[in-house]
Amino acid sequence: MGGAERVIVALDLADAQAARALVERAPAVRFWKVGLELFTAAGPGLIEWLKARGCRVFLDLKFHDIPNTVAGACRAATRLGVDLLTVHATGGQPMLMAAVSACTGEAARLGSPAPAVLAVTLLTSLDAQLLEQQLLVNVGVSGYVEHLAVLAVSSGVQGVVCSPLETALLRERCGNDFLIVTPGIRPGGSGEGDQRRTLTPGEAFARGADYLVVGRPVTTAPDPQVAFKAIVAEVGG
């Protein structure tokens, strides 16, 4: 898998029109992430449009609810043909297992590939101080992320979303067959934005990430196609 297939661009835009315009300006991008704002505004039709163009889709809605509700959402996402989807690891093992079972069961019924379920460990906007003071978790960032990743493995989840700073730890702890997707990626020379635990693309891959998620460095660039190709070149893709 080359570098272009491993760099996911976040379509963090307000509506379908803006999203489609960006996709058309950056045909080199093969994997797009659709999150809460855009999915709420544009609905499933945008996913279907992306799939019709031959794009891969990471549906990042971070499901977190009772197991039965999450299972229903995962079946619906599977019918859309998404490649990756997210659930919150803090939903607990019954919810995580229900998500995986729903995806595999619906895919088998349809005769199509099942999306990989990724457990979100700790949002990259949170750091140790916020974790301890506001969430009352006092095991530290690495300890908390490791605990949730191990929970995900034991629940049959195919991978995790985590900060690049925890990638090496989780690669060692969870093995080479476990998918690791890292947001909070900032190419050299770009700012951190609202994400506190960041690395460059090359650093994240070196620590064991399978996929990187990049947003504003591409989506707000004067030429998104050029910006994306520069990131791929940075990681030797």
Curated annotation (Swiss-Prot):
Its EC number is 4.1.1.23. It catalyses: orotidine 5'-phosphate + H(+) = UMP + CO2. The active site is at K62. One of its GO terms (molecular function) is orotidine-5'-phosphate decarboxylase activity. GO terms for biological process: 'de novo' pyrimidine nucleobase biosynthetic process; 'de novo' UMP biosynthetic process. Pfam families: OMPdecase. Keywords: Decarboxylase, Lyase, Pyrimidine biosynthesis. Homodimer. Catalyzes the decarboxylation of orotidine 5'-monophosphate (OMP) to uridine 5'-monophosphate (UMP). PANTHER family: OROTIDINE 5'-PHOSPHATE DECARBOXYLASE (PTHR32119:SF2). Belongs to the OMP decarboxylase family. Type 1 subfamily. This is Orotidine 5'-phosphate decarboxylase.
